[in-house]
Amino acid sequence: MERTLRKKRNGRVVSDKMDKTVVVAVETKVRHPLYGKTINKTTKFKVHDEKNEAKINDRVLIMETRPLSKDKRWRLVEIVEKAK
């Protein structure tokens, strides 16, 4: 699979307690089909972090990859912004 065709998401690290894995929350805006109100929908992804460099509240860019474990299908590309 071509790397350019893989999905990319921006999100925030909500957990870094696992070894080589972080949990990233990705927020998307969705319009309600009937009422038209914009709703923030949050999805959590388990992301492979080989060097254990991402910490809680970091903004990160993640990319789709082959299945690495039961739940991990995403990997860390870069840390966009470090937490303060």
From Swiss-Prot:
Q: Which InterPro entries match?
A: NA-bd_OB-fold, Ribosomal_uS17, Ribosomal_uS17_bact/chlr
* Xref: Pfam families: Ribosomal_S17
Q: Which GO terms describe its biological process?
A: translation
Keyword match rRNA-binding: yes
**Family matches, as SUPFAM superfamilies:** Nucleic acid-binding proteins
Q: Which GO terms describe its cellular component?
A: cytosolic small ribosomal subunit
Residues of the signal peptide = none
GO MF terms here are: rRNA binding; structural constituent of ribosome
Query: What are the annotated disulfide bridges?
Result: none
Sorted keywords for this record are: Ribonucleoprotein, Ribosomal protein, RNA-binding, rRNA-binding
Q: Gene3D superfamilies, from UniProt?
A: Nucleic acid-binding proteins
Is Iron found in the keyword set? no
Listed under subunit, the entry gives: Part of the 30S ribosomal subunit.
Q: Write out the function statement from the record.
A: One of the primary rRNA binding proteins, it binds specifically to the 5'-end of 16S ribosomal RNA.
Similarity comment text for this entry: Belongs to the universal ribosomal protein uS17 family.
Query: What's this protein's name?
Result: Small ribosomal subunit protein uS17
- The source organism is Clostridium botulinum (strain Eklund 17B / Type B)
Q: Which gene encodes it?
A: rpsQ
